[in-house]
Amino acid sequence: MVKKIGVLTSGGDAPGMNAAIRGVVRAALSEGLEVYGIEDGYLGLYHNRMKQLDRYSVSDMINRGGTFLGSARFPEFRDPEIRKIALQNMKERGIDGLVVIGGDGSYAGADLLTKEGGIHCVGLPGTIDNDVAGTDYTIGFFTALETVVEAIDRLRDTSSSHQRISIVEVMGRFCGDLTLAAAIAGGCEFIAIPEVEFKREDLVKEIKAGIAKGKKHAIVAITEKLDNIDELAKYIEKETDRETRGTVLGHIQRGGAPVAYDRILASRMGAYAVDLLVNKISPPLNFSSGGFCVGIQNEKMVHELISVCIAPENKKSKFKEDWYDTAKKLF
């Protein structure tokens, strides 16, 4: 069983990361473990920026957005020599367990630390994109969803006033979950996501059909990277003769106090990660095959090998086809 653990946040920040850190710290302390917070993700691990945490270090953190430990992208961590230094920094402090909060790239780093250095690593899915395999939802997804829906509601007010078509670009990388959920909750008329082939002409055809039925304004929700929003807006305006404007929500989607569900999810996952590290889950985990990651499926905490969850065939979360069918029926 581990005696000292580290916790870090890596990659893009997500609301609820602080709640997850809090869950890890307080659960670990209740098991008699020492906990070290690692600043700025793997970058801080490499530069040996660590500090011991107690229960008061995470007081008043459950409601705070962002991550008080800081986060950074550190592609140099792919270099084995860089990882050797990071491992040595942990071993000098006696750290034998590590909780990594982030996306699949962060998971990959954790898995390497386990395989190369014997550190017992557990990953928690922290990303607004909801694109991590092995879990129904990721920490931060529902808070980002509230942010996007609020923006859609505001855009609908002005779009209806001016009989305008509004395009909303939503984060998600190669996963359309956030766009899809926001489109349903925001009552969007049209949607474009990576999981379904997107063609401008098909979208315009749908918009024209809506106009023919008497539709005077519309909201189009589209996942980032599918198209250039400004160019798409000009194309739609030219083809439909309706004023069209694009709005890129950007990094505002990552900020804000986490909603209640994200706080609960993060707390449960943090505590479950500690349970895995202290062998409270039966049967005890065998870290000789690599690190593990935590997920929630049907509202129950689950775990799986990181290598399974980041495998190409499992890398993306399962497309919510039933959600998409519902959205199409309601357009």
Curated annotation (Swiss-Prot):
Q: What class of enzyme is it?
A: transferase
Cofactor(s) the protein needs:
Mg(2+)
Which PROSITE patterns does its entry note? PHOSPHOFRUCTOKINASE (PS00433)
- Which PANTHER family does the entry mention? ATP-DEPENDENT 6-PHOSPHOFRUCTOKINASE (PTHR13697:SF4), PHOSPHOFRUCTOKINASE (PTHR13697)
Q: Which SUPFAM superfamilies match?
A: Phosphofructokinase (SSF53784)
Provide the assembly information.
Answer: Homotetramer.
- Positions binding substrate in this chain are 127-129, 164, 171-173, 224, 245, 251-254
Record: residues binding ATP: 12, 73-74, 103-106
Mention one GO biological process in which this protein takes part, according to its record. canonical glycolysis
Record's Gene3D superfamilies?
3.40.50.450, Phosphofructokinase domain
In terms of one coarse class, where is the protein primarily found? cytoplasm
Reaction(s) catalysed by this chain, per the record, are: beta-D-fructose 6-phosphate + ATP = beta-D-fructose 1,6-bisphosphate + ADP + H(+)
Q: Does the record carry Metal-binding as a key word?
A: yes
* Keyword terms of this UniProt record: Allosteric enzyme, ATP-binding, Cytoplasm, Glycolysis, Kinase, Magnesium, Metal-binding, Nucleotide-binding, Transferase
Its protein name is: ATP-dependent 6-phosphofructokinase
Q: How is its activity regulated?
A: Allosterically activated by ADP and other diphosphonucleosides, and allosterically inhibited by phosphoenolpyruvate.
Please state the pathway this protein functions in, per its UniProt record. Answer: Carbohydrate degradation; glycolysis; D-glyceraldehyde 3-phosphate and glycerone phosphate from D-glucose: step 3/4
Q: Which GO terms describe its cellular component?
A: 6-phosphofructokinase complex
**Gene Ontology molecular functions:** 6-phosphofructokinase activity; AMP binding; ATP binding; fructose-6-phosphate binding; identical protein binding; metal ion binding; monosaccharide binding
Q: What stretch or stretches form a coiled coil here?
A: none
Q: Which residues are annotated as active site?
A: 129 (proton acceptor)
What's its EC? 2.7.1.11
List locations, semicolon-separated. Cytoplasm
- What biological function has been recorded for the protein in this entry? Catalyzes the phosphorylation of D-fructose 6-phosphate to fructose 1,6-bisphosphate by ATP, the first committing step of glycolysis.
Indicate the family of this protein.
Belongs to the phosphofructokinase type A (PFKA) family. ATP-dependent PFK group I subfamily. Prokaryotic clade 'B1' sub-subfamily.
